[in-house]
Amino acid sequence: MEVERVQAISKMSRCMDTIPSEYIRSESEQPAVTTMQGVVLQVPVIDLGSSNNTEENLVELIAEASREWGIFQVVNHGIPDDAIAKLQKVGKEFFELPQQEKEVIAKPEGYQGVEGYGTKLQKELGGKKGWVDHLFHIIWPKSAVNYNFWPNNPPLYREANEEYAVALRGVVDKLFEALSLGIGLEKHELKKASGGDDLIYMLKINYYPPCPRPDLALGVVAHTDMSAITILVPNEVQGLQVHKDDHWYDVKYIPNALIIHIGDQIEIMSNGKYKSVYHRTTVNKDKTRMSWPVFLEPPPELLTGPISKLITDENPAKFKTKKYKDYVYCKLNKLPQ
């Protein structure tokens, strides 16, 4: 069965002032109704490379942002601008390929994983859809990579993604260490609980084409990430929104920053000391928005739950311990955890 892609719908809708009904959100979700207008949220910005920030200071800044916000931006992160530019260039070129070429790596029908080119990710409540196409594939560790889900075109796609994966590892270690120390653990403990050297780096490219009615649609609906941590690179088109104090706010990107989301697994492992961020994405009438999140995930068979030394009689476990793959299944199918 042929799947209708949002990119194709966008092209057909260019001269219209309407979108298919399945993309129109309920009034309680519509950005025009629910966004706090005229206010842009300044989420914390943390300088990872500043000589003024001691390790102790960085730990404090990252831990506070993760407790209070669940989202922050990092600058001077050590990933070369060139590596990010190449990642973005090849991703954009993939989505500009003829449709039949993209379909070569489409998610197979009935496939239980998320890897591949696609449009639908999770159970759609009320038949409502997000205004986005995507491509998922693992970029690290090499033992977990399935190149069948990587594009052959553009020719430099593999090189750019592998270079970015290697460059990312220093930032990943720094974040896990700070988050561990920030709740009184040894610096290696949260990464070890997330899989250690088997930690999965799952890249997703989000492609949000122009939408004639951005006031009615959403790119990705409100959610928290399943991952431990998400490290995201956006293009220049704004669109990320965060839910804070019962309102939806636009988040302003800092040029050359990485956007860090605390995901469900860090909230679970920290037994609620850190908060996964509730967020969504809006779309643009005239411009294509793209983003490149990397979800840092435990291996599927790994048991994840609150770290035992954080559980006491006064602070009992707030979450179940279960295999990560079971957590993912429940989340994608909107089942209770």
Curated annotation (Swiss-Prot):
InterPro entries cross-referenced by the UniProt entry: DIOX_N, IPNS-like_FE2OG_OXY, IPNS-like_sf, Oxoglu/Fe-dep_dioxygenase_dom, Plant_2OG-oxidoreductases
Disulphide-bonded residues: none
UniProt: Fe cation binding residues: 223, 225, 279
Single GO term (MF): metal ion binding
Keywords, in A-Z order: Dioxygenase, Flavonoid biosynthesis, Iron, Metal-binding, Oxidoreductase, Vitamin C
Catalytic activity reported: a (2R,3R)-dihydroflavonol + 2-oxoglutarate + O2 = a flavonol + succinate + CO2 + H2O; a (2S)-flavan-4-one + 2-oxoglutarate + O2 = a (2R,3R)-dihydroflavonol + succinate + CO2
Co-factor: note: Binds 1 ascorbate molecule per subunit. Binds 1 Fe cation per subunit.
Entry's EC annotation: 1.14.11.9, 1.14.20.6
SUPFAM superfamilies: Clavaminate synthase-like
Any single Pfam family the record assigns to this protein: 2OG-FeII_Oxy
Metabolic or biological pathway, per its Swiss-Prot or TrEMBL entry: Secondary metabolite biosynthesis; flavonoid biosynthesis
Similarity comment: family membership: Belongs to the iron/ascorbate-dependent oxidoreductase family.
Entry function: Catalyzes the formation of flavonols from dihydroflavonols. Acts on (2S)-naringenin and (+)-trans-dihydrokaempferol to produce kaempferol and on (2R)-naringenin to produce (-)-trans-dihydrokaempferol.
The protein, known as: Flavonol synthase/flavanone 3-hydroxylase
Organism whose genome encodes this protein: Petroselinum crispum
Lineage of source species: Eukaryota, Viridiplantae, Streptophyta, Embryophyta, Tracheophyta
Gene behind the chain: FLS
